């Protein structure tokens, strides 16, 4: 069992139970999955960019990235249906906790001028989304081997019913929110 999962079970669950006033431990919010998504608009001109991006996302997540394809053709963007336009990874279970631990303890502190993540990234149902501008904050990415600095989105899906429950859960898990 990963250290963060153990911490969640032993520390976060009792704290959330008291804080939110739940009686049943199954009512307590938990993290269900983490989705990493990298959309590449420049892949329209150069489809080979997607392969490199998928490789980088695979290194960051520790799980193979899936290439996403365009659902519709859009003439103004010179986009055809079925063209590769990005990649994504969905993490669950052990890998999800390992990634969250790496994000909070290693990657986020390496962001330039980091003062905490925005508390406005909640969607109304307790899920949190944030953007990473540079993939080089992760230790798996070698700065000399990348062709271009790319950003990606991280969505943390929780079983929380409200934003406040989701915020409490993530704060207890170590997510550094801005004051």
From Swiss-Prot:
Q: What do we know about how this protein assembles, alone or with others?
A: Part of the 50S ribosomal subunit; part of the 5S rRNA/L5/L18/L25 subcomplex. Contacts the 5S rRNA and the P site tRNA. Forms a bridge to the 30S subunit in the 70S ribosome.
Please describe what this protein does: This is one of the proteins that bind and probably mediate the attachment of the 5S RNA into the large ribosomal subunit, where it forms part of the central protuberance. In the 70S ribosome it contacts protein S13 of the 30S subunit (bridge B1b), connecting the 2 subunits; this bridge is implicated in subunit movement. Contacts the P site tRNA; the 5S rRNA and some of its associated proteins might help stabilize positioning of ribosome-bound tRNAs.
What Gene3D superfamilies does UniProt report for this protein, alphabetically? 3.30.1440.10
Protein name (Swiss-Prot/TrEMBL): Large ribosomal subunit protein uL5
Pfam families the UniProt entry points to: Ribosomal_L5 (PF00281), Ribosomal_L5_C (PF00673)
Write one Gene Ontology MF term.
Answer: rRNA binding
Question: Keywords assigned by UniProt?
Answer: Ribonucleoprotein, Ribosomal protein, RNA-binding, rRNA-binding, tRNA-binding
Q: What superkingdom heads the lineage?
A: Bacteria
* Family note: Belongs to the universal ribosomal protein uL5 family.
**Biological processes annotated in GO:** translation
Q: Which GO terms describe its cellular component?
A: ribonucleoprotein complex; ribosome
């Amino acid at each position: 069992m990963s250290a963060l999962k153990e911490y969640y079970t032993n520390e976060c669950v009792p704290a959330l139970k008291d804080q939110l006033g739940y009686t049943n431990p199954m009512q307590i919010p938990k993290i269900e999955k983490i989705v990493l998504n990298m959309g590449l608009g420049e892949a329209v001109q150069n489809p080979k960019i997607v392969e490199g991006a998928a490789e980088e996302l695979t290194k960051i997540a520790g799980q193979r990235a899936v290439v996403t394809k365009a659902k519709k053709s859009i003439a103004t963007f010179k986009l055809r249906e079925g063209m590769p336009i990005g990649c994504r990874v969905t993490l669950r279970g052990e890998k999800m906790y390992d990634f969250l631990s790496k994000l909070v303890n290693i990657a986020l502190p390496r962001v330039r001028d980091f003062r905490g993540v925005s508390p406005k990234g909640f969607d109304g149902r307790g899920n949190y989304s944030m953007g990473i501008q540079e993939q080089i904050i992760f230790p798996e990415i070698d700065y000399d081997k990348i062709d271009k600095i790319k950003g990606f989105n991280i969505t943390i899906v929780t079983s929380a019913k409200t934003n406040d429950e989701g915020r409490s859960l993530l704060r207890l898990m170590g997510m550094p929110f801005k004051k």
